[in-house]
A protein has these predicted regions:
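Non-catalytic C-terminal accessory region of glycerolipid acyltransferases
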Residues: 4-5, 96-259
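Short, flexible loop segments at the rims of nucleotide/cofactor-binding pockets, characterized by
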Residues: 15-21, 89-93, 122-123
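Glycine-rich, highly charged phosphate/nucleotide-binding loops
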Residues: 23-27, 93-99
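Short acidic-hydrophobic, aromatic-tinged amphipathic segments that line or gate anion-handling sites
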Residues: 26-27, 88-91, 180
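Glycine-rich helix-loop-beta junction characteristic of Rossmann-like nucleotide cofactor-binding loops
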Residues: 29-33
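Catalytic core of membrane glycerolipid acyltransferases/transacylases, capturing the structured
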Residues: 34-94
Length: 259
């Protein structure tokens, strides 16, 4: 792929990280192969995860093609930029096309990024995973490399105001690769979830204590924080989903009434 947009965007992003005085802590990046198809599976706690997530493959000289929801590609400015970076558009109502695109990218030796939770976790811990990550990797015959992001949620996430205060730590922890066969996607997905859950616990405990006091809203309730529990987060997600459906129905009715 001929990358014209991606490299300068990376340079710009790194400059922004420096302006913000951020401390980027990378661990385990040797697990990202320098060549060949690889699927990177990320946890999802922030709207900025895909920006920072690519850093996991940076030491290996790789560019990550992220699978992202269609709405981002529908944006007048964001859409063309995303396409120029060869990211993969995902229609949550019809995911067959994105599945095949991801498999094609991987078989051509690309690094593809995916969020198995599909949406941001309000609980700050792992929600239930979709099986797509393991099915895609198995179909392409490539490894899945788990990656845990931590600290991005402090800047921009659901239900909280944006906060780009200086001097914060952002950590990315890369785990050893998994090699799905596709024989049992549910079991293989459960293995990925368990591996990443343990990595998340380790990432939270390794985060600087002075930046993460007890009761912090960005820390899971199960780890001493005040984020919603998984059950509370699921309820909020359900309410949000119903509200979006209501607004879509209203918009459809309005368009029909205008005809």
């Amino acid at each position: 792929m001929r990358d014209v947009t991606y490299p300068p965007i990376i340079v710009t992003a790194k400059a922004a990280f420096k302006v913000l005085g951020q401390r980027i802590h990378l661990a385990g990046t040797e697990h990202v192969p320098r060549e060949g198809g690889v699927l990177l599976a990320f946890n999802h706690v922030s709207y900025l995860d895909f920006i920072y997530g690519g850093l996991a493959a940076n030491p290996s000289g790789r560019l990550v093609r992220f699978m992202a929801k269609r709405e981002i590609f529908d944006h007048a400015i964001g859409g063309p930029v995303m396409r120029s970076m060869y990211h993969i558009e995902v229609d949550r109502g019809e995911g067959v096309a994105s599945f095949h695109t991801a498999v094609d990218y991987l078989q051509r030796g690309e690094a593809v990024g995916i969020f198995p939770e599909a949406t941001i976790s309000r609980a700050m811990e792992l929600k239930e995973f979709k099986t797509g990550a393991m099915r895609i990797a198995a179909a392409a015959g490539v490894p899945v490399v788990p990656v845990i992001l931590w600290g991005t949620q402090r800047m921009m996430t659901k239900d909280h105001p944006r906060d780009f205060s200086r001097g914060r730590t952002i950590s990315l922890t890369v785990g050893e690769p998994l090699h799905p066969t596709g024989a049992d996607p549910m079991a293989e997905t459960a293995t990925l979830h368990a591996r990443m859950s343990q990595m998340l616990v380790e990432a939270v405990h390794a985060y600087p204590e002075d930046e993460q006091p007890p009761g912090s809203w960005w820390v899971p309730a199960s780890m001493g924080g005040s984020a919603p529990t998984l059950e509370e987060a699921a309820r909020l997600d359900g309410e949000e989903k119903r509200e979006r459906a209501r607004k879509r129905a209203e918009n459809r009715a309005k368009r029909q009434g205008d005809k």
